[in-house]
UniProtKB/Swiss-Prot annotation:
Residues 1-82, 95-125, 398-419, 460-492 are annotated as: Disordered. Keywords: Coiled coil, Golgi apparatus, Membrane. Residues 491-603 are annotated as: Golgi-targeting domain. GO terms for cellular component: cis-Golgi network; cytosol; Golgi apparatus; Golgi cis cisterna; Golgi cisterna membrane. It is found in: Golgi apparatus, Golgi stack membrane. The lineage of its organism: Eukaryota, Metazoa, Chordata, Craniata, Vertebrata. It comes from Homo sapiens. InterPro entries: GM130_C, GOLGA_cons_dom, Golgin_A. Belongs to the GOLGA8 family. This is Golgin subfamily A member 8B. Residues 100-124 have a biased composition (Basic and acidic residues). May be involved in maintaining Golgi structure. GO terms for biological process: Golgi organization.
Length: 603
C-alpha cells in the first residue's frame, strides 16, 4: 500500500510539473495575444501598445527566468526524493525477506525442540520400564533366598534326625541286652502280644518310610527347580546388562548431538544479533538536510515499526534460545543423575551376582550332608555287625547258663573257665570298639555343627542377636523376621542339635561306663547274668524318661505284665524302621512348601 501511494503521488507531481512547464514556456506570444485582444478594437490603443511592447517583453523574460529557476530546483528535489523512496523500498523488501527467513528458522527450531522433548519422554518411559523390571528381579531374588534358606533348614532337620537315629541305635543296643534277659522269664502269651505290636510298628514304619521317600523326591525336584530358576535369572541379568550398556551408549550419542545443536544455535543467535546491529546502524544514519515529503515520513515510520517488531521477535528468539539452553542444562544434569543411577544399579547387580554365587554354596553343603549320611550308614552297619556278635555272645552265655552243672570242670581242669574268660574278653573288646566308634562319631558331628554355626554367624549382612539353645525350626516365610532373624534361628537350631546330641550320648556313655553293669573277668556265669539283669534295669530307667508309651490295648497289657516291655518294644520297632530306611529319624515330618511359592501365587 505504501509503495502504491508513493507511486501515485509521484505520478501526480510529474503531471503538475509538466502542465506548469507547458504554461510557462510559450508565455510571451500568449500574453501579447491576450493583451491585443483586450485592447485591440481601436488603432490608437494599438499604437500606444506598440510603444510599450518592448518594455513588456523585457519584463516577461525576466519573470520567466525567475520562475524557471524554482521549477528546476523542485524537479531536482523530486528526483532525489524518488531515488530515496526507491532505496527505501529496496530496504523494505530486504527486511521482509530477512523477516521471512527468521520466521522460517524459528519454526525449524521449534520443530527440533519438539522432537528433542519427544525423545526425552521416550527415554524417561524406557527408564521407568527398566526400573519396574529391576523391582521384579529384586522380588524374585528375595523369594529365591527364602526358598534356599528353607532347604538349608530342612537339611539341618535331616542332620538332626541322623543324630537321633544314632542315639537310638546306642539305646537299642542296651535295650536288646535287657530284652534278652527279660524274655527268658516271660510266658508265651506275651510273645504273641509283642508280635502284634511289632507288626503294627512295622506297618507304621513302612508308611513313614514311604512318606520320607516322597519327601526326599520332592526335595530333589525342588532343588532342581531352584537351580534352573537361578540359571534363568543369571541369563536375564546378563541380557539386561547388555541392554543397559547399549542404552547408555545411545544416551551418550544423543548428548553429543544436543551439544552440537546448542553450539549451532548459539552461532545462529550471534549472527542474528549482528544483523540487528547492522540494521540499527542503518536506521541511525542521518538523513540529508532536504525535508522529506509527508508520504516518505509515513513510510519511514512504518519501516521503524517493522524494524522494532523484528527486533522484538529477535529478542524473543534470543530469550527462547536462553530458555532452551537452560532446559538443555537441566537435561544434562538429569542425564548425569541417570548415569549415576545406572552405575549404582550396575554395582547392585554385581553384588546380586555375588550373592547368587554365595547362594550356590548350600549345594556343596547338601553334598557334604550326603557324604555324612554315607559315613553314618557305614557306622550303622558296623554297629549292626557288633550287635550280631553281641547276640552270639549272649546266646553262648545263655547256653552256658542252661547247662551249668554239665559245664562245671574238675578241680584240676580249667578249659571251660578259660572259654568263658575268652568270651568275656571278646565282649569287653566289642564294647570298647563300640564306644570308640560312638566317640568318633560324636566328635565328628560336633565339629560339623560348630563349623555350620560359625559359618552362619560369620556370614556378611547377618547377625546372631536371637540365637539361643531353644530357638529352632524357623520357617523361611516372607513375613517372619528377616535375613538376620533367619540366620540367627538357623544358628540356634545347630546349637540346640549339638547340645541334644551331646546330652544323649553323654547318658549313653555314662550307662556304658557304669561299673555296676560291667562283669568281673573272673566271675562265674550266674554272677554275669545277674550283672546283666542289673544293667537291664538301668537301661529301663534311662529309657522310660525319653520314650512315650504305646497306644491301645497293648499299652494296658504290657504295663500290667512288665513295665520294661513297653519302651523296649517301641525301640525294637524303631530299629526295624532304621534298618528299612537308615539315616532318618522316627518322627515323620512332611514339610510345607508354601513359603517358596506363595508370593508367586499372589502375583
Amino acid at each position: 500500500m505504501a509503495e502504491e501511494t508513493g507511486q501515485s503521488k509521484l505520478a501526480a507531481a510529474k503531471k503538475k510539473f509538466k502542465e506548469y512547464w507547458q504554461r510557462n514556456r510559450p508565455g510571451v506570444p500568449a500574453a501579447a495575444k491576450r493583451n491585443t485582444k483586450a485592447n485591440g478594437s481601436s488603432p490608437e490603443t494599438a499604437a500606444s501598445g506598440g510603444c510599450h511592447s518592448s518594455e513588456a517583453s523585457s519584463s516577461a523574460s525576466s519573470s520567466l527566468h525567475a520562475r524557471q529557476s524554482p521549477c528546476q530546483e523542485q524537479a531536482a528535489v523530486l528526483n532525489s526524493r524518488s531515488i530515496k523512496i526507491s532505496r527505501l523500498n529496496d530496504t523494505i523488501k530486504s527486511l521482509k525477506q530477512q523477516k521471512k527467513q527468521v520466521e522460517h528458522q524459528l519454526e525449524e527450531e521449534k520443530k527440533a525442540n519438539n522432537e528433542k522433548q519427544k525423545a526425552e519422554r521416550e527415554l524417561e518411559g524406557q527408564i521407568q520400564r527398566l526400573n519396574t523390571e529391576k523391582k521384579k528381579l529384586n522380588t524374585d531374588l528375595y523369594h529365591m533366598k527364602h526358598s534356599l534358606r528353607y532347604f538349608e533348614e530342612e537339611s539341618k532337620d535331616l542332620a538332626g534326625r541322623l543324630q537321633r537315629s544314632s542315639q537310638r541305635i546306642g539305646e537299642l543296643e542296651w535295650s536288646l541286652c535287657a530284652v534278652a534277659a527279660t524274655q527268658k522269664k516271660k510266658p508265651d502269651g506275651f510273645s504273641s502280644r509283642s508280635k502284634a505290636l511289632l507288626k503294627r510298628q512295622l506297618e507304621q514304619s513302612i508308611r513313614e518310610q514311604i512318606l520320607l521317600k516322597g519327601h526326599v523326591t520332592q526335595l530333589k525336584e525342588s532343588l532342581k527347580e531352584v537351580q534352573l530358576e537361578r540359571d534363568q535369572y543369571a541369563e536375564q541379568i546378563k541380557g539386561e546388562r547388555a541392554q543397559w550398556q547399549q542404552r547408555m551408549r545411545k544416551m551418550s550419542q544423543e548428548v553429543c548431538t544436543l551439544k552440537e545443536e546448542k553450539k549451532h544455535d548459539t552461532h545462529r543467535v550471534e549472527e542474528l544479533e549482528r544483523s540487528l546491529s547492522r540494521l540499527k546502524n542503518q536506521m541511525a544514519e542521518p538523513l540529508p538536510p532536504d525535508a522529506p515529503a509527508v508520504s516518505s515520513e509515513v513510510e519511514l515510520q512504518d519501516l521503524r515499526k517493522e524494524l522494532e517488531r523484528v527486533a522484538g521477535e529477535l529478542q524473543a528468539q534470543v530469550e527462547n534460545n536462553q530458555c532452551i539452553s537452560l532446559l538443555n542444562r537441566g537435561q544434562k544434569e538429569r542425564l548425569r543423575e541417570q548415569e549415576e543411577r545406572l552405575q549404582e544399579q550396575q554395582e547392585r547387580l554385581r553384588e546380586r551376582e555375588k550373592r547368587l554365587q554365595q547362594l550356590a554354596e548350600p549345594q556343596s553343603d547338601l553334598e557334604e550332608l550326603k557324604h555324612e549320611n554315607k559315613s553314618a550308614l557305614q557306622l550303622e552297619q558296623q554297629v549292626k555287625e557288633l550287635q550280631e556278635k553281641l547276640g552270639q555272645v549272649m546266646e553262648t552265655l545263655t547256653s552256658a547258663e542252661k547247662e551249668p552243672e554239665a559245664a562245671v570242670p574238675a578241680s584240676g581242669t580249667g578249659g571251660e573257665s578259660s572259654g568263658l574268660m575268652d568270651l568275656l574278653e571278646e565282649k569287653a573288646d566289642l564294647r570298647e570298639h563300640v564306644e570308640k566308634l560312638e566317640l568318633g562319631f560324636i566328635q565328628y558331628r560336633r565339629e560339623r555343627c560348630h563349623q555350620k554355626v560359625h559359618r552362619l554367624l560369620t556370614e556378611p549382612g547377618d547377625s546372631a542377636k536371637d540365637a539361643s539353645p531353644g530357638g529352632g525350626h524357623h520357617q523361611a516365610g516372607p513375613g517372619q523376621g528377616g535375613e538376620e532373624g533367619e540366620a540367627a534361628g538357623a544358628a540356634g537350631d545347630g546349637v540346640a542339635a549339638c547340645g541334644s546330641y551331646s546330652e544323649g550320648h553323654g547318658k549313653f556313655l555314662a550307662a556304658a561306663r557304669n561299673p555296676a553293669a560291667e562283669p568281673s573277668p573272673g566271675a562265674p556265669a550266674p554272677q554275669e547274668l545277674g550283672a546283666a539283669d542289673k544293667h537291664g534295669d538301668l537301661c529301663e530307667a534311662s529309657l522310660t524318661n525319653s520314650v512315650e508309651p504305646a497306644q491301645g490295648e497293648a499299652r494296658e497289657g504290657s504295663s500290667q505284665d512288665n513295665p520294661t516291655a513297653q519302651p523296649v518294644l517301641q525301640l525294637l520297632g524303631e530299629m526295624q524302621d532304621h534298618q528299612e530306611h537308615p539315616g532318618l529319624g522316627s518322627n515323620c515330618c512332611v514339610p510345607c512348601f508354601c513359603w517358596a511359592w506363595l508370593p508367586r501365587r499372589r502375583r
